[in-house]
């Protein structure tokens, strides 16, 4: 009897060892692949770059144009937006706000009352635009279009011959439009880097210079083709909703 029990126990051990060895030889299923990257989601980020204003002023008294020279300045701010991806197509909206450090220095013009120069300083730029483009894995190539607004702390008109000047003329916010393009690259599922170029065109406006001795007679200036070109480097944190 004891002999049979020992034989049965030995058989059980051999059977268990055989099952264990067979299980060890079975292939382990591969982990599922990660979900494909998606640009869908809300994002927030920051940017820095440069801005180059353009355009001219025409005075009604002498009919002379004051051309805006090649001036560049620094911009820095942030953006908030939303993307929605459909296959390889992405649509979205974005709002930007940037502080501007630049001086708009218009050319010196000789007039019968002296050499006149006009300067102004932009203080901020804000935009609201749509972004539309193609997504290729971690890359997003897009075009951008919408509205733009620029804040200005007013013009200073100076008679360089007499050293007389008037400041704070026409401090205002000018409205206009924006058109641009850019490329964005996703480092991870949440962090992205981007480069963007934008052209901003603004509506023309008038402002008056009151007669002030020994300055110049009363005059009215009209802006022409007021524009700003911007190039930016930026980053975004994407709250990815696509997986």
Task: Please place each PLM-identified region on the residue numbering.
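Gram-negative outer-membrane beta-barrel domains
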Residues: 2-243
């Amino acid at each position: 009897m004891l002999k049979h029990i020992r034989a049965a126990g030995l058989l059980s051990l051999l059977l268990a060892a055989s099952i264990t060895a067979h299980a060890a030889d079975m292939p382990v299923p591969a982990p599922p692949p990660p979900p494909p990257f998606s640009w869908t989601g809300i994002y927030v980020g920051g940017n820095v770059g440069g801005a180059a204003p353009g355009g001219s002023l025409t005075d009604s008294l002498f009919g002379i144009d004051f051309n805006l020279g090649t001036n560049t300045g620094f911009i820095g701010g942030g953006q908030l937006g939303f993307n929605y991806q459909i296959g390889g197509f992405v649509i979205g909206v974005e709002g930007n706000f940037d502080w501007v450090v630049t001086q708009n220095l218009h050319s010196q013009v000789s007039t019968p009352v002296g050499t006149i120069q006009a300067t102004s300083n932009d203080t901020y730029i804000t935009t609201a635009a749509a972004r539309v483009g193609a997504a290729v894995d971690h890359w997003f190539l897009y075009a951008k279009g919408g509205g733009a607004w620029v804040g200005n702390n007013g013009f200073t008109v100076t008679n360089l011959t007499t050293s007389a000047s008037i400041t704070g003329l026409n401090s205002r916010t000018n409205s206009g439009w924006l058109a641009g393009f850019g490329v964005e690259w996703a480092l991870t599922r949440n962090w992205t880097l981007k480069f963007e170029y934008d052209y901003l065109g603004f509506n023309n406006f008038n402002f008056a210079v009151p007669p002030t001795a020994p300055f110049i007679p009363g005059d009215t200036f009209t802006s022409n083709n007021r524009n700003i070109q911007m190039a930016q480097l930026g980053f975004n944190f994407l709250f990815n909703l696509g997986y």
